[in-house]
Swiss-Prot record:
The gene is ftsY. It is found in: Cell inner membrane; Cytoplasm. Gene3D superfamilies: Apolipoprotein (1.20.120.20), P-loop containing nucleotide triphosphate hydrolases (3.40.50.300), Signal recognition particle SRP54, nucleotide-binding domain (1.20.120.140). Residues 1-10 have a biased composition (Basic residues). Keywords: Cell inner membrane, Cell membrane, Cytoplasm, GTP-binding, Hydrolase, Membrane, Nucleotide-binding, Receptor. This is Signal recognition particle receptor FtsY. It comes from the Bacteria. InterPro entries: AAA+_ATPase, P-loop_NTPase, Signal_recog_particl_SRP54_hlx, SR_rcpt_FtsY, SRP/SRP_N, SRP54_GTPase_dom, SRP54_N_sf. HAMAP family: FtsY. SMART domains: AAA (SM00382), SRP54 (SM00962), SRP54_N (SM00963). It comes from Neisseria meningitidis serogroup A / serotype 4A (strain DSM 15465 / Z2491).
Amino acid sequence: MFSFFRRKKKQETPALEEAQIQETAAKAESETAQVIENIKEDAESLAESVKGQVESAVETVSGAVEQVKEAVAEMLSEAEEAAEKAAEQVEAAKEAIAETVGEAVGQVQEAVATTEEHKLGWAARLKQGLTKSRDKMAKSLAGVFGGGQIDEDLYEELETVLITSDMGMEATEYLMKDVRDRVSLKGLKDGNELRGALKEALYDLIKPLEKPLVLPETKEPFVIMLAGINGAGKTTSIGKLAKYFQAQGKSVLLAAGDTFRAAAREQLQAWGERNNVTVISQTTGDSAAVCFDAVQAAKARGIDIVLADTAGRLPTQLHLMEEIKKVKRVLQKAMPDAPHEIIVVLDANIGQNAVNQVKAFDDALGLTGLIVTKLDGTAKGGILAALASDRPVPVRYIGVGEGIDDLRPFDARAFVDALLD
């Protein structure tokens, strides 16, 4: 009996264990399935989340790209507009420059034409003014330039003509040597060829006298003191110089320093009214005081140029020469570097005596320039050659007529052409 029960129990145990195993397996399978399901759900959720984030990121990037595209497009549009505007401005600038340059060229051409016309007009007046000197020389030189063979007789005849034309011995000797050298150098044979040789020799001699007055760029008045003998044309030259400087855009003030002659003061005042220029004068007092007051007035008024007249005097009048030295000293007190220019006015009619005058005034004052007047009324045009040879003080201006425009800067070439052509 006992063995029966024991065998039965042994048979029940494996069945129970198998059932438990199956139950455990089923439970494990269920749990595994649940885990897998959970994992699957988590994976799907994660995938969905990632997908959403990716789509959001893509959308954000796409928006940014669009914004960049729009910004770039806007910048390109603005750049194109700026380029078009710049191109328009460049074209406008080109047109403006072309117009300005065209106007400037036109003005320059007009100025050149006016200058050439003026030169021609002055050359004609100069030639007309030197008629007496030219006619005298032409008549005397007719035999020299008549076509004969160049020999010693011809040279002697030429030398005589030069001496009688007031060129003086020193200038004549210089010219004769120069002409001989040119004849020898160029192999000239005929008297007709002497004219060119003489013209070039005379030009080379008087060319150093051609030193136009150049006004400095300064805010201080430029003081010009004029001296000379009575009747040389100082006062008239001052009036013409005032007009000449005004034409250059300069303001001018006149000092009536010829206190010896009431007529001189009145004449200068008439020139002042004619040119609308202030004249400083005194009914009493000396020349130095008038000139001092004139410089002070010019400094106060911002005047560019002071033209100071002085009384006429002969170099032999020693007390008057001392007086004009005083005028110079007083001008230096009024302005340390004044007078900036000291000019003697010469009457061309006095011929060789002009050289002596220049020497005397130069020794007394230290001349910086000359004005040679009345060349139209004399046959002594050779005086410039004498001056060039003996005392070569620069000839600032020459006068060949009574007109207000008949006082001009000295041009050596124009003078020689007018004298010998």
